[in-house]
Amino acid sequence: MRIILYDRLQDSQYFEEEIHAAVKAAENAGTYVMVHVYVPQAITRAIQAGVKSIEHGHLIDEATMELIARKEVWLCMQPFTLDDNQYPTQEQQEKHKMIVQNTDNAYRLAKKYQVKLGWGTDLLFNPANTKNQNKDIGKLKNWFNNFEILRMVTYDNARLLSLSGSRNPYPGDLGVIKEGAFADMLLINGNVLENIQLLENPDDNILLIIKDGQIYKNKL
């Protein structure tokens, strides 16, 4: 999250022409471009350049959210809270606080305009924090019911990744359980439609992990 660590939040960085060149190069390679961005001006610039997915976007305003919906661009946000990260300087802490304070507004606008929502985290780069990813899923309860959350993190995420077209490395459909699909499945000890926070304790509550048809964990 370079923009929090070093840059000003209002910096838009790349010119539209530069982003457009990246989009065309990606299209030539059969895939798409996503951008990590927070502020309305930068989000709008990216969309105008042909970007298909906005990562983060927490400082978005209503006009820009309406643009995302109209252009059918994906928005991949995270339910940030003040205790997510401990930044070393006061300036970095203040920038993180601004993002956290607008997270509620961003999710409410996304629901209002029925934007296509994906979900992901940056925690994969920090093995010690990887277990906290499932806690972030639970935080989505502030805006979505459990069915909406499960659909977002499975089926909807798979739809987003399918934008990679011919470069998609998976031989079957993702995010669904059906014959011929890519066999990634979890068996949970409990009903996550009733209690999404079961996922926050994977050691005890995830009984079976199947990835690409191979069993990686079996506590049955």
Question: What is the predicted role of each segment?
Answer:
Residues 1-105, 118, 123-124, 189:
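Active-site core of metal-dependent hydrolases
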Residues 167-168, 179-220:
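C-terminal cap of metal-dependent C-N hydrolases
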Residues 90-97, 171, 199-202:
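Short, surface-exposed loop/helix-turn segments at secondary-structure junctions
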Residues 37, 46, 67-69, 110-112, ...:
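Extracellular/periplasmic catalytic domains that process cell-envelope and extracellular macromolecules
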Residues 20, 66, 150-151, 197:
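Generic structural signal for individual residues within well-ordered alpha-helical segments
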Residues 13-19, 100, 169-180, 205-209:
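Glycine-rich, flexible loop segments associated with nucleotide phosphate handling
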Residues 28, 32, 101-191:
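His/Asp/Glu-enriched, well-ordered alpha-helical/loop segment
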